Amino acid sequence: MLSAVARQMPREAPSPFQIVTGMSAGAIVAAAVACHAARFREGVVALERVWRNFHSEQVFRADAASMLRAGLRWTLALLSAGRLTAPPESVFDSSPLGHLLERHYDFKRMRQAMADGHLESLAIAASNYRTARSVAFYESRDPEPAAADGWQRGVGTQLSVTHLLASSAVPFLFPAVRLDGEYYGDGAMRQIAPLSPAIRLGADRLFVVGVRDQPKSPDMVATDRVPAPSVGQVIGFMLDTLFIDSLHAGVAQLERINRLIEQSAVPSPEGLRRIEPLVIVPQADFSAIAARHARAMPRSVRALLRTMGASNVGGSELLSYLLFESSYTRELIAIGREDAMARRDEIAHFLGTSVRTSAATTRVRRAATIESAPLPATSLALAR
């Protein structure tokens, strides 16, 4: 999706997004955009290179020895009722992902982009297991953004790879991450206001990228031969329910508020303003795509999924949370690019970009914009 946007930008142009937010897998993408805010296209190319060459071993330990140790520990904890050993914190060890992010993410570069005026804020959402509430960790050029005043779920901090690991820690599958004495998990869990961080940080326009479409009504015929759901299918269903998509509801609420503001004859209350959204959601069934690439997964993971009954189409939901192989990610990149190119003119109009705009012209316009009356702050919001 972002690669199509980057293709519309001059090669050396800075990011068109002054405020970047992300949750779950979107947090990893958002941080990459923020770290390369000074040279947007270069950053997207680097990000795509990583995703196009992904393998499970770069995200979690999938070798037979690691899987066997985890299995034995689970078994021993179960048989001893936890007296001999505590069960593992999760099914998989996600430490390889931390190493990968440490190699590719330079938050000092992000802070330099803020100092140079290319970026206002980055916010990463994660879910607090103790309070069952979503928290937005943010870092801004302005230490105390005016719009964030009274924001109870916003925590100003110095962002790091640890925040990305917390936001992308899928429950049960990957371990919770400790931040400031609290444990956090995937930022998409019970997320009821995915657009709030960007709005709180001052955005007037929202470019929203999601990966989950609105629920579809499958054309299914009732039959007495429907098999009982497997453990893997149930877990996949539970995760899918836990990550229930609130993106469309948030956009619908935003559009209702916009209409009320436009129709109101009196000035809006302080802090209430019209916000223009553009939402891009790939029109694809990611579970079905994941099922086609299941054999690309490590043999040990495939064996685990088979024991859980998640190796067939019914278990494709769970499979989609664990599939990090290049054949799968390359197909997703291609789908996202096609969807974005189909709306190329709409995106270019929204961002105010032109394919023929020179890098020099872009820099002059940006400088003039910052030094005089600024255009509305454009935010990039990325969701799982």
Could you describe each region identified by the protein language model?
Residues 115-209, 214-239, 314-323:
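Active-site gating loop/helix substructures
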Residues 108-109, 190-195, 257-267:
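Glycine-rich, charged/polar anion/phosphate-binding loops
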